[in-house]
Swiss-Prot record:
Signal peptide: none
Superkingdom: Eukaryota
Top EC category: transferase
Name of this protein: NAD(+) kinase
Keywords, sorted A to Z: ATP-binding, Kinase, NAD, NADP, Nucleotide-binding, Phosphoprotein, Transferase
Known partners and oligomeric status: Homohexamer.
Length: 530
């Protein structure tokens, strides 16, 4: 019933949007208001669906819970009849408190199991509208895009390919010639724009990127609400987010489009900027009223950075968590990063690596004045607020995934929380995160220690072996050396009568090798390997 209501709501929203597009200029404000209302409805429906799934999980274990509660009640009643003790609240035989706590613990366990099931769920894609995002400042990728589009048009007749509108008049891409070569209609090649994506974010079934990590971040910036699954081919300078090789696209694309796939729902952060205006005086009460204006909201995949910008002074930033003041940071800035962004700016500033499947917020200071201000990992449920202190000497600057840089005056603040719109990426392999940090960062890569004899010439190796055998033959067994050392040391101690003298010699004469105890070959010295 709820799924039908949600589908009807989506269809209604699409129809309303299509009707408004014809009168966009006249009804712009009305459309924005409707989109905000529908966004709130979508969030409510998502929460209701999650609650319904939790109810199903709880109902599956209701019989087991009832049996345990009945058993506990019988034990409590038995103790009460035999003159046993009372419960915590002073009443005999009451299991209300334990029942409530048991339900609470069961719900928490159900949430963890639900999260685990979602992370392991495989989704079957019915791809009809394929979107291709190309790194436009690399000319060589124009031809690779052409090759990919031609192959898809030939092998997937039901698929309509959408490419960047910048390629429409490109001679390198040559859409008309491409349709002739693939023997398909020109209507199967269409072009997407940012405005089209903002209005139809659920239109595409799969996004394929040709570029590097910056191309993936660009996809996140244009899909500010729902994001289709993203399959990224590594054709850039970095490769933390691009785990597919382009030379294997003929094998990987059919597997993704024809079979069930596993996606990683990467956490994004919802960042909202608020501008503080000068306080106004209420004419009735005479009190000052602080006016705050909401400027914009960004859903980011990597990090939000609040720094001092061109100012030579340190930033003074007040950090709040769930409404409580956590600390006042005097530093070059602060970084609030997602697990995906933990390998970017946050890592360079000394932050920790975080697996993308862990939902958390990595807070990393940039060159803090206090060395005790260390990076910290916070839960995704926390609501952060970073405010430019009124005592700050200069304004601050904020950037979202390195873009949309904006100046923050004294009193301005940014709220940071987990975004309801995750960023799904197609999983190439279960260990792709470890492979990426090992490949890009040389994580825990070290040279194996080599044997000393490997760098010796043949002549010196023979001399070394001869000397090793000579020392081995002269050395007495370790047990004999220990006995001699202990006996002679006791004799020397008796002769000294417990007094220290400059003439005392702590060395022990060894009849076999005439060496001091410190020169007696140790087991590691006596057993040579050539």
């Amino acid at each position: 019933m709820k799924e039908n209501d949600m589908n009807n709501g989506v269809d209604k929203w699409v129809n309303e949007e299509d009707g408004r597009n014809d009168h966009h200029n006249n009804n712009n404000n009305l459309m924005k208001k409707a989109m905000m209302n529908n966004e709130q409805i979508d969030r409510t429906q998502d929460i209701d669906n999650a609650k319904e799934m939790l109810r199903k999980i709880s109902s599956e274990s209701s019989s087991r819970r009832s049996s345990l509660l009945n058993k506990d009640s019988s034990l409590v009643n038995g103790n009460a009849n035999s003159g046993g003790g009372t419960s915590i609240n002073g009443t005999r035989g009451s299991s209300k408190s334990s029942n409530t706590h048991f339900q609470y613990a069961s719900t928490a366990y159900g949430v963890r199991m639900l999260s685990k099931d979602i992370s392991n769920t495989k989704v079957e894609l019915d791809v009809e509208n394929l979107m291709i995002v190309t790194k436009l400042n690399d000319v060589s990728l124009y031809f690779l895009t052409r090759e990919l589009v031609e192959w898809v048009l030939v092998h997937f007749p039901r698929v309509t390919v959408y490419v960047d509108s910048e390629l429409k008049n490109s001679k390198k891409f040559a859409a008309g010639e491409l349709c002739e070569d693939s023997k398909c209609r020109e209507s199967r090649i269409k072009y997407w724009t940012k405005d089209f994506i903002r209005e139809h974010d659920v239109f595409f079934d799969l996004v394929v990127t040709l570029g590097g990590d910056g191309t993936v971040l660009f996809v996140s910036s244009i899909f500010q609400r729902h994001v289709p699954p993203v399959m990224s081919f590594s054709l850039g300078s970095l490769g933390f987010l691009t785990n597919f090789k382009f030379e294997h696209f003929r094998e990987d694309l059919p597997r993704i489009m024809n079979h069930k796939i596993k996606t990683n729902l990467r956490l994004r952060l919802e960042c909202t900027i608020y501008r503080r205006h000068r306080p106004e005086v209420d004419p009735n009460t005479g009190k000052k009223i602080c006016v705050v204006e909401k400027l914009s909201t960004h859903h980011i995949l990597n990090e939000v950075t609040i720094d001092r910008g061109p100012s030579p002074f340190l930033s003074m930033l007040e950090l709040y968590g769930d409404g409580s003041l956590m600390t006042v940071a005097q530093a070059d800035g602060l970084i609030a990063a997602t697990p995906t962004g933990s390998t970017a700016y946050s890592l360079s500033a000394g932050g920790s690596l975080v697996c993308p499947t862990v939902n958390a917020i990595a807070l990393t200071p940039i060159c803090p004045h206090a060395l005790s201000f260390r990076p910290i990992i916070l839960p995704e449920s926390i609501n952060l607020k970073v405010k430019v202190s009124m005592k700050s000497r200069a304004p601050a600057w904020a950037a979202f995934d390195g873009k949309d840089r904006i100046e923050l005056q004294k009193g301005d603040f940014i709220t940071i929380c987990a975004s309801p719109y995750a960023f799904p990426t197609v999983e190439a392999s279960p260990d792709e995160f470890i492979n990426s940090i090992s490949r890009q960062l040389n994580w825990n890569v070290r040279e194996q220690q080599k044997s000393f004899t490997h760098i010796l010439s043949q002549k010196n190796q023979e001399k070394y072996a001869h000397e090793a055998n000579k020392v081995r033959n002269q050395a007495e067994p370790l047990e004999v050396i220990r006995d001699k050392y202990s006996l002679e040391a006791d004799a020397t101690k008796e002769n000294n009568n417990g007094s220290d003298d400059e003439s005392d010699d702590e060395s022990v004469n060894c009849e076999a090798c005439k060496l001091k105890p410190s020169s007696v070959p140790k087991p590691s010295q006596a057993r040579f390997s050539v």
